[in-house]
């Protein structure tokens, strides 16, 4: 038995470990869907896959508690697939390798999937525990939350039964989330006719790497380096000073993760390679001085001589693209005026792919205000349309408006104080949660989000704080037992 399965409470950790052994990257969920269906049937609860690909459990009330308000427990089954450069992990076929490092559970070379595997594991523990006392419980485990909340957006109306929604996708133990930001995906694209490379030119690959990355909602306010935004500074100077020409660009791979690596292939006269290397070395020094408190592990900016490609980006298009990337806002745009420590609006320059006659730039914009979300979209449209790019939006979801008078919130705060002797914290998150989407279909629900502590989700340093899982479980059980009558 893996040591993780012996952690307290075993009912959650054994289920979480089992989830790590089933591949479940966003977009490839057939194995985890079948696993959850089989689990539900073995647990003796109602278990179906709905037309959207979500898994729906239903557990009847403990005898005598049928008159309690119905609770819907909710989490998402998919995980962000990120791995270290040296990792050979295949997320579609290989199990995650979790391990215990002191007070944390981590993964070897990949994301851990505690976001949102611990929430799913808690739901599984509720479903299979015959000793718990509770009213009627529905559970919704959604598909593809990380890539656009597709399961929640396609949730059939009328599928769920309940009065209260408890989302288990928050990542700060002791904080109870009652609101979150909305978001929208913005994609700029351009098709272009490639130019021939000068046959006498050399080529180099310039890479910015070893950044921390992170969650583009929860950690956007920390000032972490964005590999695309750092690389564009380097590339812009190399074009100006060494006659370099852009052949290709690849940076970032997840819309909701701060990119930790980006690389560009450049062509240039052979006699300018030495000057290029000096400029790149200077940028590495500059970046490490600028980010020394935020990226203490050390940012790497490296040059590798590569085979000269046959084609490159035409000069005018290259200049337009580089200028647009340079001008594109990244990071926090505004904080909530009434809560100056809470981010209201942000954008994440997430993914850039340029080469073979195509350019694609993807940004995730977030805001707790619809008018500010629209403002960011217009700003990005202006930025990239000036470069001749076509700008489209998709995957829009609204924010979740806080309800400080929520009955389930105040029950949780009461139980938390009685169990642990301290006050819980009410919070509004800048991250997107499925609560807003589900509320759009079930507007009468009383909603709250909670969970154990996790750090650096969406990165290869993702980790779960072991000591917070047991109290999370105790609070969940006690709250379900004390849900009021209808």
List the predicted regions and their residue ranges.
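Acidic/His- and Gly-rich active-site-bordering loop/insert found
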Residues: 3-103
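Acidic, glycine-rich active-site loops and adjacent beta-strand->loop/helix elements
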Residues: 77-79, 140-148, 170-173, 212, ...
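His/Asp/Glu-rich mid-to-C-terminal helical/loop segments that flank catalytic regions of hydrolases
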Residues: 158, 224-241, 268-273, 319-326, ...
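Active-site-adjacent substrate-binding region
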Residues: 219, 226-228, 232-249, 402-445
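Zn-dependent metallopeptidase/amidohydrolase metal-coordination segment
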Residues: 9-12, 337, 344-359, 364, ...
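Substrate-recognition/cap regions that form aromatic- and gly/pro-loop-enriched pockets
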Residues: 342-431
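Midchain, well-structured core segments that form catalytic/ion-binding scaffolds
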Residues: 103-106, 146-147, 153-365
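Active-site metal-coordination/substrate-binding segment of hydrolases
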Residues: 65-163, 203, 315, 326, ...
């Amino acid at each position: 038995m893996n040591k993780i399965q012996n952690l307290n409470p075993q009912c959650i950790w054994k289920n979480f470990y089992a989830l790590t052994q089933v591949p479940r990257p966003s977009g490839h969920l057939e194995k985890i869907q079948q696993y959850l269906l089989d689990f539900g049937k073995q647990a003796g609860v109602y278990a179906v896959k709905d037309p959207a690909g979500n898994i729906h459990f239903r557990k009847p009330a403990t005898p005598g508690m049928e008159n309690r308000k119905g609770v819907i427990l909710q989490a998402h089954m998919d995980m962000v697939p990120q791995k270290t450069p040296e990792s050979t992990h295949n997320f579609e076929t290989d199990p995650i390798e979790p391990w215990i490092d002191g007070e944390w559970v981590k993964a070897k070379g990949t994301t851990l999937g505690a976001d949102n595997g611990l929430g799913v594991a808690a739901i599984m523990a509720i479903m299979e525990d015959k000793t718990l006392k509770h009213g009627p419980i529905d559970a919704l485990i959604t598909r593809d939350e990380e890539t656009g909340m597709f399961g929640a957006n396609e949730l059939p109306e009328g599928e769920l039964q309940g009065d209260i929604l408890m989302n288990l996708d928050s990542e700060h133990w002791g904080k109870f989330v009652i609101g979150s930001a909305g978001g929208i995906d913005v994609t700029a694209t351009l098709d272009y006719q490639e130019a021939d490379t000068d046959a006498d030119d050399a080529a180099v690959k310039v890479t910015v790497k070893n950044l921390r990355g992170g969650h583009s909602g929860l950690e956007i306010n920390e000032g972490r380096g964005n590999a695309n935004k750092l690389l564009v500074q380097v590339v812009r100077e190399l074009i100006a000073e060494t006659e370099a020409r852009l052949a290709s660009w690849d940076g970032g791979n997840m819309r909701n993760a701060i990119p930790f690596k980006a690389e560009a292939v450049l062509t240039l006269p052979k006699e300018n390679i030495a000057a290029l290397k000096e400029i790149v070395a200077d940028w590495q020094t500059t970046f490490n001085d600028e980010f020394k408190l935020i990226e203490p592990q050390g940012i790497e900016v490296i040059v590798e001589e590569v085979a000269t490609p046959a084609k490159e980006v035409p000069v005018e298009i290259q200049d337009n693209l580089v200028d647009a990337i340079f001008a594109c806002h990244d990071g926090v745009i505004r904080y909530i005026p009434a809560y100056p420590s809470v981010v209201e609006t942000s954008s994440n320059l997430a993914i850039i792919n340029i080469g073979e006659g195509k350019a694609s730039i993807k940004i995730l914009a977030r805001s707790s205000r619809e008018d500010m979300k629209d403002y960011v979209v217009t700003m990005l449209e202006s930025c990239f349309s000036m470069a001749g790019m076509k700008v489209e939006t998709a995957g829009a979801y609204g924010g979740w408006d806080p309800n400080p008078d929520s009955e389930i919130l105040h029950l949780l705060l009461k139980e938390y104080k009685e169990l642990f002797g301290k006050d819980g914290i009410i919070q509004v998150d800048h991250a997107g949660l499925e609560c807003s989407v589900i509320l759009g279909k079930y507007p009468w629900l009383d909603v709250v989000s909670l969970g154990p502590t996790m750090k650096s989700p969406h990165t290869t340093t993702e980790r779960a704080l072991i000591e917070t899982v047991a109290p999370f479980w105790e609070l969940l059980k006690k709250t379900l037992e004390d849900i009021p009558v209808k």
